[in-house]
């Protein structure tokens, strides 16, 4: 609907410009004989009337759609942008792409939101030799604001800032809607498919701390897109093909010669890999056999394929232990899946004249990229470049993805830029239609600010890290004597929630492009922007109703019958903060930076604390502790905060508990 309005508006403006041009031309003509009716002008005027009529119908339909009750939360920022966009277009119809800047206000004295477009418009008019002050422009914009249900009043401040004050009834109604219908977004990705490529460890190698970020970020990104209504395919592009499998299979044949009939007890696959690598580097005969195994693997020899599957199964079992612990959902689709497509990929690039031969290699130069892609090695083998080209084509043409997101470290940025550019160059996708993005991230550092290693200098095993987290979180809970008030089951749930929640949050709360220091002491601190603090805050909020003997059924009834009052400044601040949730999620869907959600949840928790310290939810007798009065509208605000925090935690992959 919005798109049709915009399209008609653009056509209307174009027609009006043409009418002005023709009218001016007629006025300039001195010879009266030329002033006969212009068929061109009449045709434009008739078309213009039709467009205006159609536009009015569309606008009325849009307004009716807006007023229709919805179970979903509203993105208030987006709605205000639409209003100010209409006002600016009406006030300055001749300006092309005027700036539209609407943001939440940082201080209460500046209202709830601010429109800061006037300064930019002033500069645009100045370039057209029209000198108009930003303040005059702001006044003109406000005069053209359409009638709406959101805004109570606007004020012009300073040089031309437009301060927007929301209607209290509107905010109260939206909070009631949230409580009655739950935390729901409008369906943004209906019939759209998103592929998220993340984790991607190598077969026969253990997952280490380097895989942590991709796994955590990719899972959270997938959950966000699913919540927004997209059909999400989570792919684990494991390294399950290549020359290293030749040495692994040859070593398996030597160590477990009866592997075809008796399942080999490989056990420690990491040690098995190191043994085979040592032999590959030192034994020439073994190296020769390893290469022969690679050739047999590529030709799908049944015995060699069984050995390959055995090795993959052992790895998969170890990976799944970590995925189960962290509640990660993935579909494995490794490099082997794309092997049969490689030949056609090379042929397509050759047929279109993009391939050059360099020292026996087949390479592809991509405009704007400094390093060419190598799609065939000098020995005739394929490369990661070929594999990734085959993967992106399969995802675009067979999966029919609308968005593809690769969650891979910053070190691969140049590689992916080149692969994406090559896919565009050959015509596989148009970036204006299909979004293909590399979600890069920095490395995990130790407290010495160097790459996170064990004391012996080895890479930290991810399973060891998770077990250390469990131990430390239990120590923290016992230090706070929670073991004396929680049941054994509750204590175990709290231990897992804190351990894994803190590890995930410490990662996600940092700007992903930056390196971050891994510190259990910091992440388990229950002060500041940490999962420990937020999980404790959540359990405290959930306990307020319980301690006042108010159950879920009573809260649901109150949500339908009790108006949420927002007269106290802290009530108003909290109510507005709760309703910013959809605009926060929209921002992340646009820029793919999850730390924004962490910052928001922390802001929500601290805003709640301000509210709770200033506004009594439950009034008790100071001597007996007996509940004298329950301010139900405030209890409902508590529940709204908890509902939004719970959904935020869910997107981040964190499992809160009711008691801690």
Swiss-Prot record:
Provide the protein's localization. Answer: Cytoplasm; Cytoplasm, Cytosol
N-acetylmethionine PTM sites in chain numbering: 1
Pinpoint motif 'HIGH' region by residue range.
201-212
Q: Which reactions are catalysed by this chain? A: tRNA(Arg) + L-arginine + ATP = L-arginyl-tRNA(Arg) + AMP + diphosphate
The segments labelled Could be involved in the assembly of the multisynthetase complex in the record are 1-72
* Region called Interaction with tRNA, residue ranges: 529-543
The UniProt keyword set, sorted, is: Acetylation, Aminoacyl-tRNA synthetase, ATP-binding, Cytoplasm, Ligase, Nucleotide-binding, Protein biosynthesis
Q: Name one GO biological process term.
A: arginyl-tRNA aminoacylation
Query: Which stretches are transmembrane?
Result: none
- Gene3D superfamilies hit by this protein: Arginyl tRNA synthetase N-terminal domain (3.30.1360.70), HUPs (3.40.50.620), Isoleucyl-tRNA Synthetase, Domain 1 (1.10.730.10)
Q: Where does L-arginine bind?
A: 200-202, 211, 384, 388, 412
Q: Describe, from its UniProt entry, the tissues in which this protein is expressed.
A: Detected in dorsal root ganglion.
A single Gene Ontology CC annotation of this entry is: nucleolus
Q: Which Pfam families match?
A: Arg_tRNA_synt_N, DALR_1, tRNA-synt_1d
Q: What is its EC number?
A: 6.1.1.19
Family statement: Belongs to the class-I aminoacyl-tRNA synthetase family.
Matches recorded under NCBIfam families: argS (TIGR00456)
Function according to Swiss-Prot or TrEMBL: Forms part of a macromolecular complex that catalyzes the attachment of specific amino acids to cognate tRNAs during protein synthesis. Modulates the secretion of AIMP1 and may be involved in generation of the inflammatory cytokine EMAP2 from AIMP1.
Q: How does it assemble?
A: Interacts (via N-terminus) with AIMP1 (via N-terminus); this stimulates its catalytic activity. Interacts (via N-terminus) with LARS2 (via C-terminus). Monomer. Part of a multisubunit complex that groups tRNA ligases for Arg (RARS1), Asp (DARS1), Gln (QARS1), Ile (IARS1), Leu (LARS1), Lys (KARS1), Met (MARS1) the bifunctional ligase for Glu and Pro (EPRS1) and the auxiliary subunits AIMP1/p43, AIMP2/p38 and EEF1E1/p18. Interacts with QARS1. Part of a complex composed of RARS1, QARS1 and AIMP1.
What's noted about domains in the record? The alpha-helical N-terminus (residues 1-72) mediates interaction with AIMP1 and thereby contributes to the assembly of the multisynthetase complex.
- Name used for this protein in its record: Arginine--tRNA ligase, cytoplasmic
Q: Which organism is it from?
A: Rattus norvegicus
């Amino acid at each position: 609907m919005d798109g049709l309005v915009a399209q008609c508006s653009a056509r209307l403006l174009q027609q009006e410009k043409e009418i002005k041009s023709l009218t001016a031309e007629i006025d300039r003509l001195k010879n009266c004989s030329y002033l006969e009716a212009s068929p061109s002008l009449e045709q434009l005027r008739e078309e213009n009337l039709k467009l205006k009529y159609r536009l009015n119908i569309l606008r009325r339909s849009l307004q009716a759609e807006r007023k229709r009750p919805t179970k979903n939360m509203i993105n208030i920022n987006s709605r205000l942008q639409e209003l100010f966009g209409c006002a600016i277009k009406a006030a300055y119809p001749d300006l092309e792409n005027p700036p539209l800047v609407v943001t939440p206000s940082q201080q209460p004295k500046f209202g709830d939101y601010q429109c800061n477009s006037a300064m930019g418009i002033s500069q645009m008019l100045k370039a057209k030799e029209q000198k108009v002050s930003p303040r005059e422009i702001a006044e003109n914009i406000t005069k053209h604001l359409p009638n709406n249900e959101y805004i109570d009043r606007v004020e012009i401040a300073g040089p031309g800032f437009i301060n927007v004050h929301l209607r209290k009834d509107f905010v109260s109604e939206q909070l009631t809607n949230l409580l009655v219908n739950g935390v729901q977004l409008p369906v943004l990705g209906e019939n759209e498919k998103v592929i998220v490529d993340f984790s991607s460890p190598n077969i026969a190698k253990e997952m280490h701390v380097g895989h942590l970020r991709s796994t955590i970020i990719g899972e959270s990104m997938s959950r966000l897109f699913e919540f927004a209504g997209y059909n999400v395919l989570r792919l684990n592009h494991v390294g399950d093909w290549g020359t290293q499998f030749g040495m692994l299979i040859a070593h398996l044949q030597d160590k477990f010669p009866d592997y075809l009939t008796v399942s080999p007890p490989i056990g420690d696959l990491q040690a098995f890999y190191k043994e085979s690598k040592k032999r590959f580097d030192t034994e020439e005969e073994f190296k020769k056999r390893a290469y022969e195994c690679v050739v047999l693997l590529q030709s799908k020899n049944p015995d060699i394929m069984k050995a390959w599957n055995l090795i993959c199964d052992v790895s998969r079992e170890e990976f799944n232990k970590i995925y189960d612990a962290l509640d990660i959902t993935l579909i494995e689709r490794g490099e082997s899946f794309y092997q049969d497509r490689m030949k056609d990929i090379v042929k397509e690039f050759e047929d279109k004249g993009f391939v050059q031969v360099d020292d026996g290699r087949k390479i592809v130069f991509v405009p704007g990229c400094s390093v060419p892609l190598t799609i065939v090695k000098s020995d005739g083998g394929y490369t990661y470049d070929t594999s990734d080209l085959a993967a992106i084509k399969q995802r675009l043409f067979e999966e029919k993805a609308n968005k593809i997101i690769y969650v891979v470290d910053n070190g691969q940025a140049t590689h992916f830029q080149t692969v994406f550019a090559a896919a565009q160059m050959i015509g596989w996708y148009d970036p204006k239609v299909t979004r293909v993005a590399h979600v890069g991230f920095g490395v995990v550092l130790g407290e010495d600010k160097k790459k996170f290693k064990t004391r012996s200098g080895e890479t930290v095993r991810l399973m060891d890290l998770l077990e250390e987290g469990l131990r430390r979180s239990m120590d923290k809970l016992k230090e706070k004597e929670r073991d004396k008030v929680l049941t054994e089951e509750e204590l175990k749930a709290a231990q897992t929630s804190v351990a894994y929640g803190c590890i995930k949050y410490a990662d996600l709360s940092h700007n992903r492009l930056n390196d971050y220091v891994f510190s259990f002491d910091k992440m388990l601190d229950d002060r500041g922007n940490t999962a420990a603090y937020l999980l404790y805050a959540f359990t405290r909020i959930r306990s307020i109703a319980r301690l006042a003997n108010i159950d879920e059924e009573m809260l649901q009834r109150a949500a339908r019958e009790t108006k949420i009052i927002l007269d106290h400044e802290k009530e108003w601040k909290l109510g507005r903060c709760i309703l910013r949730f959809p605009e926060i999620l929209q921002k992340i869907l646009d820029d793919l930076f999850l730390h924004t959600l962490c910052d928001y949840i922390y802001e929500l928790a601290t805003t709640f604390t301000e509210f709770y310290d200033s506004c009594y939810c439950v009034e008790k007798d100071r001597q007996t502790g007996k509940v004298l009065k329950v301010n139900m509208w405030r209890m409902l605000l508590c529940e709204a905060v908890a509902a939004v925090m719970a959904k935020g935690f869910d997107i981040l992959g964190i499992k809160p508990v009711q008691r801690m």
